[in-house]
């Protein structure tokens, strides 16, 4: 790739080079992924990576593509069933990159993941360039800074999470629009980019709002922003307008998240001020000097919260040398203050958590914002020849020293289990490789500085060439460590998901509703089949799922993974088939589970049918109170819930006459034989038909007497129900499932799901868009009048 000539011709304040940066970043991203695409392609597979990228991102994009085109509000394939908007707005619903993939058939979506990744790298670089060119006098160095941002350690690391790159790509445009609004009084773009970023990801937008406040205060304090009351009011109006335009998904998400225990995790005591492990501080420190390791691995440090945190501020070649120089020579500049404030935030837990609504769970997923400022500071100092001669050499020496100091952890004596070894790193070979690549970057930068005078006017082009070339090298190392570290585990991923799905659907019956179980298979198999599966990986499912599962012996954080030993849950949740990968059959047989019969097979799976399957929707002869249920162990809870319906005291008063209170003797009869009898009883009391729809479900029941009908569907405020056309109360039973009272005789039961808050938030968004359109038209007319008067 030739970099020079007209591409990097020195122009200050001249023609924008946005598209040059865009295509340059796109080309390097293509080169970065191409070798891995070829390797996967040789097996006839699309690019698959590791961890969340495979388990969530590919399946989410493919499933959502199909779901959106078919329409609907309720997703049966999402765990036990969840509202589509609330389950996927964090991941993709508001992403412009996802909506681009709707141009393709859903079966093609996995093949579009890499082109979308390349596009995100390009959009990120282009946006960073547009923002930086105001602050960096030389256009050539603006391009360098933009490419540093596009290929920062944060960006490369978060390929693993895919949708995080949407945020990285779009944020610089909002920051540029803020500068334009304050410094140039160009007000039209800021509300638009606020709306785009909020719609794209409400969770990350919370952190962006905090960073923008830090940025704004530092810019005012540093004298860059000159404010008056009128301008401040205009900015407040634009901010509110942008938030209103982008709030279409915010209200439904907020209503769901406030019920999600993962989002309500406050600090306590020392937790506000200090991390629980000293190694956490060391990990944060070295994240600036060493290229990032695979997100799912620990190497240099073992204690603390280190995996999947996005903890890296690494910049290819230049590292943080530019930031050190900038903070030394321009210490009063707002950028220096911003970087110092962010540094303090990184080391103080409660300040770090400001970017995540004060949640105590540790993440560093806001680092991309100070990284953008760091890239600009680097470009601003590199364009000063005198700094390259003096300050940069000292800063680079300090960076080299800090990077090499990590060797101490590879050489310190370590005694474990009576054996003394050298070093505390988990995988010495991987550590030395990471150190070698990191020091290669330092060495290349030293050479660039050493030959700066000889390069003269070609120095910016040389730096850009080396940055992009090294980004390819270290990016390849990182992608390879991450991808091939799970190579054997993920070798059959495409075959057992995307390729196998049509074959499985051809074998599995579709004449009646049922759920699936998947024994030790790849995550989210149900999404590929568009069927409900009790094994599921998604953080933002219906909150009732997170309430229900822990009460029946299932840990529910980001995954639903009921163990095979909890056999009674399969009856309660209407699981009819278990899919067992053929290489896992031996482990499955060791479980020695009763009641499962091999009925079919496909290329990769054996299919076992549950002879104790209970259709969806059934009644009980007994109920159990919350007080009595608390005495039941979690492992036996499923057995008890097959005997009796769990009711609150208030529900007992209203519906207790329909059933008998479960006796202690009955509660203690929890053998497998008792379970079989309970399944038979529930099956005999089941509704005569059940149909899952894209907006809920319908059922027909013929009851001998009035009773509550349980549906093992997560309770959600968005559900309304009618029985024989008459509105009915939806009851929350069994710590998170739904039931409705039906009279004796024949009943038509209809549950309809409307995403709570969606209609109102869309109305606010639509109204704000109208206001925005009128406002922009007024601004445009005013500008034309001013131009006419000047002419």
Located regions from the model:
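Membrane-interface helix-loop-helix junctions at transmembrane boundaries of multi-pass membrane enzymes
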Residues: 225-233, 322-346
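Hydrophobic alpha-helical membrane-insertion signals
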Residues: 3-86, 483-523, 527
């Amino acid at each position: 790739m030739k970099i020079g000539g007209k591409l990097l011709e020195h122009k200050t304040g001249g023609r924008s080079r946005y598209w040059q940066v865009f295509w340059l970043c796109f080309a390097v991203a293509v080169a970065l992924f191409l070798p891995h695409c070829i390797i996967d392609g040789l097996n006839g597979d699309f690019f698959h990576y590791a961890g969340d990228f495979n388990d969530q991102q590919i399946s989410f994009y493919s499933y959502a593509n199909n779901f959106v085109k078919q329409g609907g509000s309720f997703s049966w394939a999402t765990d036990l069933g969840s509202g589509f908007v609330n389950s996927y707005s964090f991941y993709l619903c508001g992403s412009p990159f996802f909506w681009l993939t709707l141009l393709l058939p859903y079966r093609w979506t996995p093949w579009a993941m890499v082109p979308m990744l390349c596009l995100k790298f390009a959009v990120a670089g282009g946006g960073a360039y547009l923002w930086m060119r105001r602050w960096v006098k030389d256009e050539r160095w603006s391009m360098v800074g933009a490419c540093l941002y596009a290929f920062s350690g944060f960006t490369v690391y978060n390929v693993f999470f895919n949708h995080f790159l949407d945020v990285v790509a779009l944020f610089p445009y909002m920051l540029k629009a803020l500068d334009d609004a304050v410094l140039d009084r160009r007000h039209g773009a800021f509300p638009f980019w606020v709306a785009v970023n909020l719609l794209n990801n409400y969770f990350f937008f919370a952190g962006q709002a905090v960073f923008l406040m830090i940025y704004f205060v530092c810019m005012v304090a540093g004298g860059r922003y000159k404010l008056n009351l009128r301008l401040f009011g205009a900015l407040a109006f634009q901010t509110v307008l942008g938030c209103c335009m982008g709030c279409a998904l915010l209200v439904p998400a907020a209503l769901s998240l406030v019920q999600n225990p993962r989002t309500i995790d406050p600090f306590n005591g020392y937790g506000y001020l200090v991390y629980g492990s000293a190694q956490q501080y060391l990990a944060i420190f070295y994240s600036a000097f060493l290229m990032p390791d695979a997100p799912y691995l620990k190497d240099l440090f073992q204690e603390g919260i280190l995996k999947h945190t996005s903890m890296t501020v690494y910049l290819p070649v230049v590292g943080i040398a530019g930031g050190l120089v900038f903070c030394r020579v321009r210490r009063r500049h707002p950028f220096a203050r911003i970087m110092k404030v962010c540094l303090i935030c990184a080391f103080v837990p409660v300040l770090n958590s400001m970017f995540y609504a004060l949640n105590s769970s540790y993440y560093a997923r806001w680092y991309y914002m100070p990284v953008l400022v760091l890239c600009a500071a680097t470009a601003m100092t590199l364009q000063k020849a005198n700094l390259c001669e003096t300050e940069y050499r000292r800063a680079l020496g300090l960076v080299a020293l800090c990077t090499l100091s990590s060797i101490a952890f590879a050489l310190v004596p370590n005694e474990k289990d009576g054996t003394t070894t050298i070093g505390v790193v988990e995988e010495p070979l991987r550590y030395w490789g990471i150190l070698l690549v990191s020091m290669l970057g330092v060495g290349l930068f030293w050479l660039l500085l050493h030959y700066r005078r000889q390069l003269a006017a070609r120095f910016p082009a040389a730096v850009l060439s080396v940055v992009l070339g090294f980004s390819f090298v270290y990016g390849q190392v990182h992608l390879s460590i991450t991808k091939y570290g799970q190579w054997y585990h993920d070798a059959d991923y495409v075959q057992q998901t995307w390729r196998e799905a049509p074959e499985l659907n051809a074998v599995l019956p579709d004449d009646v509703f049922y759920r699936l179980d998947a024994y030790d298979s790849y995550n989210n198999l149900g999404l590929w089949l568009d069927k409900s599966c009790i094994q599921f990986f998604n953080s933002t499912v219906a909150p009732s799922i997170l309430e229900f599962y822990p009460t029946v012996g299932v840990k529910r954080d980001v995954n639903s993974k009921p163990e095979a030993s909890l056999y009674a849950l399969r009856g309660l949740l209407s699981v009819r088939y278990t899919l067992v990968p053929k290489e896992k059959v031996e482990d499955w047989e060791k479980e020695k589970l009763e009641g499962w019969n091999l009925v079919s097979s496909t290329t990769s799976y054996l299919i076992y049918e549950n002879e104790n399957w209970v259709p969806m929707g059934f009644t009980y002869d007994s109920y159990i109170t919350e007080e009595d249920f608390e005495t039941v162990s979690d492992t036996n809870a499923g057995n008890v819930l097959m005997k009796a319906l769990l009711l609150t005291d208030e529900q007992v008063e209203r519906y207790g006459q329909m059933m008998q209170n479960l006796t202690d003797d009955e509660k203690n009869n929890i053998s497998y034989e008792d379970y079989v009898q309970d399944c038979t009883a529930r099956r005999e009391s089941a509704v005569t038909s059940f149909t899952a729809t894209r907006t809920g479900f319908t059922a027909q029941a013929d009851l001998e007497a009035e009773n509550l009908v349980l549906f093992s569907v997560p309770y959600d405020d968005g559900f309304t129900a009618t029985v024989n056309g008459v509105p009915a109360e939806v009851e929350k039973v069994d710590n998170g499932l739904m039931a409705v009272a039906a009279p004796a005789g024949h009943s038509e039961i209809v549950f309809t799901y409307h995403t709570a808050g969606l209609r109102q938030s869309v109305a606010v968004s639509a109204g704000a868009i109208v206001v925005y359109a009128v406002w922009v038209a007024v601004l445009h007319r005013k500008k034309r009048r001013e131009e006419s008067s000047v002419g």
